Amino acid sequence: MYYGFDVGGTKIEFGAFNEKLERVATERVPTPTDDYPLLLETIAGLVAKYDQEFACEGKIGLGLPGMEDADDATVLTVNVPAAKGKPLRADLEAKIGRSVKIENDANCFALSEAWDEELQDAPSVMGLILGTGFGGGLIYEGKVFSGRNNVAGELGHMRLPLDAWFHLGDNAPLLGCGCGKKGCLDSYLSGRGFELLYAHYYGEEKKAIDIIKANAAGDEKAAEHVERFMELLAICFGNIFTANDPHVVALGGGLSNFELIYEEMPKRVPKYLLSVAKCPKIIKAKHGDSGGVRGAAFLNIKG
């Protein structure tokens, strides 16, 4: 049995998967964001509960919005303050009495998609999340590629490329990022970035869904904004794909439901790639919000 935990800022989602990788149990509980002992107890309690239910010791994987420090294995995270700077893996292993694997939640999302039946033959799968933030992960031959510092998938903290600044024009906003730097892709390509750019250029705040609906209805400002954003996305995807060269790219997060992306990217991205390169297949993520839990559980298969 494989246990997956998706530890977010407000909730912990648990999933149990059998040997056929079928989900056989689900539970959601509030995240004790500021109480580290309670966080440990909550996770350990769920493990004990489902060990008893399934009469076995499940293998444990955990995804969270952050990463482990590659040198001392303490957790680097903003959204789960209780775990910040703590040796979460070591403390969980001591409390539960078995191995625990921890990975960035975007990498878990990517791993979930890579292990979908339709993509298992793809040598490399990249998962990109266009949600509240922008980030992703690269899966190579069924394994998460984390890099020396466990930051290989932190694409949201790459800077906006020169082509993008030219495209956005003289009035381009220099947006700050939660990491403390400015100009990060996270601030521009996320659903939040989609809204911030609209507010910057048109002086009014609108939700992403309302901008998309206005575009479909023929609104001139919305149409201009969508055109600008699609080209911006293509420019940045071109840089990311050139550096990583994935076979398949799966998009998740709220903005990934904007169907126009799947029509426009195959047409726009190629001009930002090397002349010998082909644009990878770009698809909508199949497992949606459950991807983080699936990927966390699957860390113990090939992760």
UniProtKB/Swiss-Prot annotation:
Its EC number is 2.7.1.59. Disulfide bonds: none annotated. Keywords: ATP-binding, Carbohydrate metabolism, Kinase, Metal-binding, Nucleotide-binding, Transferase, Zinc. GO terms for molecular function: ATP binding; N-acetylglucosamine kinase activity; zinc ion binding. One of its GO terms (biological process) is N-acetylglucosamine metabolic process. ATP binds at residues 4-11, 133-140. It comes from the Bacteria. Pfam families: ROK (PF00480). Zn(2+) binds at H157, C177, C179, C184. Pathway: Cell wall biogenesis; peptidoglycan recycling. It catalyses: N-acetyl-D-glucosamine + ATP = N-acetyl-D-glucosamine 6-phosphate + ADP + H(+). Belongs to the ROK (NagC/XylR) family. NagK subfamily. Catalyzes the phosphorylation of N-acetyl-D-glucosamine (GlcNAc) derived from cell-wall degradation, yielding GlcNAc-6-P. This is N-acetyl-D-glucosamine kinase. It comes from Vibrio vulnificus (strain CMCP6).
